Amino acid sequence: ADAPTRGTLVSDWLSSGAAGANNGAHETPLAYLRHVAQTGDIYNGFNLLVGDWARRELAWYCNRSNLAPALLAPGTHGISNAILDTAWPKLVKKRAELGSLLTRNAMPPLERLIDLMRDPRVAPDDQLPSTGIPLERERALSAAFIETPEYGTRGTTALRVTALGDIVNVAVAERSDDNGSHRIVRPGDFERSFAFNVEREVV
């Protein structure tokens, strides 16, 4: 049988997290992910982050890991196609670059964050991870922005959440490199951005 869609894992949290539905399973990010983990093996592989601004909590779970759902400590983290903070060259490099950028400017333009991730440079061979795939493919996948004829980065999204008093501002920018047919197209062919405010509940 086909695996169920992973999209509902996001929409379920967004639609019912604040309401504390499912007998309290969605009350907090960590409680929700523990609920998800009970049936996590029925889905294709995923990393899932869910957060609650009022609680200042962000939690992570990967259904291809033996690690239990966990709250993230404050700081700069990274996720690639593995578990949280796996020390692959591109993750280590981009996490350091992001930290440096935020030190210089705590509110960088979203476009700058997107540009940071759209880096096609591959890692030197002596820094490549050993994941069991051919060396040529290991090289290609070591780039933050992957470009191959049959596989590549489809989109890059930057999300920023800030607060002023009881108002939370959410800003999103996205640059797409795919026309919906799974074919790589010219970089930046589709771009979109939006922002909205949310009045938060204080717990």
Model regions: which residues?
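N-terminal nucleophile
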Residues: 1-203
